[in-house]
């Protein structure tokens, strides 16, 4: 199974989304949700719940996903960008199950390096027998004092929004997330709502995914990759809370 997770390069217009609105207060478990709470930690590879990607993604991804780059150290998942005799290698980790509306969160520390992306997102597409729907949290390694939010509905993107964090995400673990509802997506940083989108919201359940990769042909977006290897993004845990019925 090959998953093509195309992420559009930023445009000037993409930085200013017409969907921005005043963020809503953070939902409180037990009131906004029905009490269904699933925490996924990374003490070891749970093969019944997760899978490691093992293929080249092509296009702007200048590396090959390999399970060798998905490691578990000190209770954390480490996704590494490296190189072998065939070229650059990178890491991607995903759930086997699909998740719909609800609160998605990750505690992570991204890579600080030009030309690379560290991410947390939901995705489903043609390789899953569905339309392409996706919701993204992406760190562009050239400047980890900001984070990019984005989403795709039936393959239609251009919803990029840059949020300035007020800290360097690569220097420590922080919690990032999004609350996906039928008519909106609200993104969070350390429990505080920072951005909401309302336009053409995706509706297809997707897999929870994380990856770290180096780009090619997207220098305007990521800045040129400098060839540095053995660099890693770290993930402490992810969680999913289902909404109240």
Swiss-Prot record:
Keyword Disulfide bond belongs to the record: yes
Keyword terms, alphabetized: Disulfide bond, Glycosidase, Hydrolase, Secreted, Signal
Entry keyword annotation includes Plastid: no
Secretion signal, residue range per the UniProt entry: 1-29
GO molecular function: licheninase activity
Catalytic activity: Hydrolysis of (1->4)-beta-D-glucosidic linkages in beta-D-glucans containing (1->3)- and (1->4)-bonds
Active site: 134 (nucleophile), 138 (proton donor)
One GO process term, biological-process aspect: carbohydrate metabolic process
Cystine connections: 63-90
Enzyme class: hydrolase
Pfam family, one: Glyco_hydro_16
Comment on pH dependence: Optimum pH is 5.8-6.2.
Temperature-related behavior of activity: Optimum temperature is 45 degrees Celsius.
GH16 domain span: 30-245
GO cellular component, one term: extracellular region
InterPro entries registered for this protein in UniProt: Beta-glucanase/XTH, Beta_glucanase, ConA-like_dom_sf, GH16
Compartment(s) where it occurs, according to its Swiss-Prot or TrEMBL record: Secreted
EC number, as in UniProt: 3.2.1.73
Family listed: Belongs to the glycosyl hydrolase 16 family.
Protein known as: Beta-glucanase
Source organism (scientific name): Orpinomyces sp. (strain PC-2)
Gene: licA
């Amino acid at each position: 199974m090959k998953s093509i997770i195309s992420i559009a390069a930023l445009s000037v217009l993409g930085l200013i989304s017409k969907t921005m609105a005043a963020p809503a207060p953070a939902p409180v478990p037990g009131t906004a949700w029905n009490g269904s709470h699933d925490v996924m930690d990374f003490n070891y590879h749970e093969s019944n719940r997760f899978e490691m990607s093992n293929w080249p993604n092509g296009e702007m991804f200048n590396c090959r996903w390999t399970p060798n780059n998905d490691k578990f150290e000190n209770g954390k998942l480490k996704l590494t960008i490296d190189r072998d005799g065939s070229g650059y290698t990178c890491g991607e980790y995903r759930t086997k199950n699909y998740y719909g509306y609800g609160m998605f969160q990750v505690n992570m520390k991204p890579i600080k390096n030009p030309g690379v992306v560290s991410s947390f997102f939901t995705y489903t597409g043609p390789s899953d027998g569905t339309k392409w729907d996706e919701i993204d949290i992406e760190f562009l390694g050239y400047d980890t004092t900001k984070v990019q939010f984005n989403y795709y509905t039936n393959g239609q993107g251009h919803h990029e929004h840059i949020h300035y964090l007020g800290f360097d995400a690569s220097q420590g673990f922080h919690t990032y997330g999004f609350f996906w509802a039928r008519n909106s997506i609200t993104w969070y940083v350390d429990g505080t709502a920072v951005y909401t989108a309302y336009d053409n919201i995706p509706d297809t359940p997707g897999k929870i995914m994380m990856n770290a990769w180096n780009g090619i042909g997207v220098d305007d977006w990521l800045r040129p990759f400098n060839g540095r290897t053995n660099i890693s993004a770290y993930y402490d845990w992810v969680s999913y809370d289902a909404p109240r019925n």
